[in-house]
Amino acid sequence: MQTLLSRESVALEILRKPELFPSLPKRREFDRLICLWRIPSFEPHSSWSLYRGRETNENFVRRLEHDPRRGFPSNVVDPHIFGSEVPIPTEMATKIIEQFEGLTVPMFRSPAWAGVDGVSFGAHIGNFWQSTTVNWWSSFSPEWKPLNELFQETVAQLDSLLPTSTLRKIEL
């Protein structure tokens, strides 16, 4: 197991494995249907996850947020993550999963460029036994446009169910 030495590395680990977040109802990796994350260079980092309830078969969406500009960088004990979770209609959760599962993109292409400032995106479906994880940069190849569009549409849908974020810039 890797030792995480900075607050941001701990926060990113929790954003990508949101069942590690202790301040919301306990969830298991095997109940997670999908996890999406957006890591901008100069804005709060966010992840959205869909979970199926173990006893009720009810679905939930969980959003976690972390602002790397806040707090003391070496404080790995408290990485300053904010979370919210609400029920999501089963039909909506099913449609989201089906859309991601039906997506086709060329997977094993070397990127044509690299970036420093921008946004890193990711999606993870599955668990320890079988899974797919995809990461891409804000300057993605044209073949990945459907993935990026589906990501943006899904995040907008999920955010419409969740309370307003207290970390993102709010227009007055």
What are these regions (language model features)?
Residues M1-L172:
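Function-determining sites in protein domains
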